[in-house]
Amino acid sequence: MISPGFSHFTELAQQGNFIPVYQEWVADLETPVSAWYKVCSSQPYNFLLESVEGGESIGRYSFLGCDPMWVLEARGDETTQVLRNGQTETFRGNPLDILSQCLESIRPVNLPQLPPGIGGLFGVWGYELIRWMEPRVPVYEPQPEDPPDGIWMQVDHLLIFDQVKRKIWAIAFADLRGENVDLETAYRNACQRVTKLVLQLQLPLPPEATALELLTKTQLEGKELNYSSNTEQEKFLEEVAIAKDYITAGDIFQVVLSQRLSTIYRDDPFKLYRSLRLINPSPYMAYYNFGHWQIIGSSPEVMVKADRQLDGKLMATVRPIAGTRPRGKTHPEDEQLAEELLNDPKEIAEHVMLVDLGRNDLGRVCVQGSVKVNELMVIERYSHVMHIVSNVVGELASDKTAWDLLKACFPAGTVSGAPKIRAMEIINELEPERRGPYSGVYGYYDFEGQLNTAIAIRTMVVQEQPDGAHRVSVQTGAGIVADSDPQKEYEETLNKARGLLEAIRALS
């Protein structure tokens, strides 16, 4: 049964102009992947977000949607909005301000019985957006073949899976903005979209939704994946040496240098996501389809979160990850590597520095005295690597929003360095190309003003080529400090890419 009923809906219309209409049901036979095939696979713009918390246990909610109200794409000084009906408008100036302006007219009605993230913005904030937050930081200008600096979908209907209660919500928003809006028509339209989502889930799987066939470890032996890098190994080692000179000179304490590995893939990009979620599961699994290119993410690291508390206040969270070891082949070896990691002076010094940076970032927008480290230097294990992780929280000041929080923390210190501004200047000097989505963030901003973003690491950028094949790029970095060994830092970038490259190789 669809809720709320029309009588209750008319009462809610006094509270705002964007009202959720929904249907919920128990559905333990449907999965987010099968639902994506039924609802989203034929749409040019769509997304699927899932979570495997700590790399080991399933997160509670999954989100999927398509057919957005509008798409906003930022590239250099221009930001273009494309409406659902195809109408376009181009703006000049700060895309983050334009993004906020596009949302200004929405006054959502919040229903406490619904899960978080029930609608809003879903998309990607690329690294080069830093030019609008810290104008002194130089960035490469975009080229026609580059992904946009940022791209966002405004979603007004979606499906949410509750993996704990085995429920599905089909949600659509009734839009009451504009003059002389008829409540009954708006309500009926939202109900029709909810019903359409429900009926789509009752359809059989489309022909392209075949069982995923991954090569076994035996089949993969001796089978190499051909890829190229945007830098030579010797060049990377030279860049590390230059970065260490800057550290010795007192310019910085740390800087993250990266390389981009690229290969050609000739099948459906969504299969890459399915392979990645099996081979390299993470807390922030994501598939964003933007037509001719996709973001496929398995990030382990939250960038920033802003969660609405029962008292209406926003709680801010950053969760720095720094310190890496490969997983052991046996349990004793795994434990030994974890102990070694927690007793490595270089890794500990780097991690503590980034925790302090996270505290300072939150301190810029949180209530004085509210910023706390509530989890310090614990080991989190993933399929191919383990990390040292800490958690920093604070109460967002009453005059600050989730957008202020994002600007205060962007980009994360774990992918830039410290001090952050000077580190980013050095990144622009030493790295050969713009970073694009890598080290930016992906996630959502919902209608309650909550924000949930992951750092775009362990992430594939998939771009369609003229011959119909796909260029898949994976970018990974290493934190350079005073006593860094250049060769080990180079190897760390390859270790971090291993899970993603294996997901591609398993489909070869």
From Swiss-Prot:
Taxonomic path: Bacteria, Bacillati, Cyanobacteriota, Cyanophyceae, Synechococcales
Residues at which chorismate binds: G323, T324, Y438, R458, G477, A478, G479
Function recorded in the entry: Part of a heterotetrameric complex that catalyzes the two-step biosynthesis of anthranilate, an intermediate in the biosynthesis of L-tryptophan. In the first step, the glutamine-binding beta subunit (TrpG) of anthranilate synthase (AS) provides the glutamine amidotransferase activity which generates ammonia as a substrate that, along with chorismate, is used in the second step, catalyzed by the large alpha subunit of AS (TrpE) to produce anthranilate. In the absence of TrpG, TrpE can synthesize anthranilate directly from chorismate and high concentrations of ammonia.
Entry protein name: Anthranilate synthase component 1
Transmembrane segments: none
InterPro entries: ADC_synthase, Anth_synth_I-like, Anth_synth_I_N, Anth_synth_I_PabB, Chorismate_C
Originating species: Synechocystis sp. (strain ATCC 27184 / PCC 6803 / Kazusa)
SUPFAM superfamilies cross-referenced by the UniProt entry: ADC synthase
EC code: 4.1.3.27
Gene Ontology MF, one: anthranilate synthase activity
Activity regulation field: Feedback inhibited by tryptophan.
Binding site for L-tryptophan: S51, P283, Y284, M285
EC main group: lyase
Residues the record lists as binding Mg(2+): E350, E492
Associated pathway: Amino-acid biosynthesis; L-tryptophan biosynthesis; L-tryptophan from chorismate: step 1/5
Assembly and interaction partners: Heterotetramer consisting of two non-identical subunits: a beta subunit (TrpG) and a large alpha subunit (TrpE).
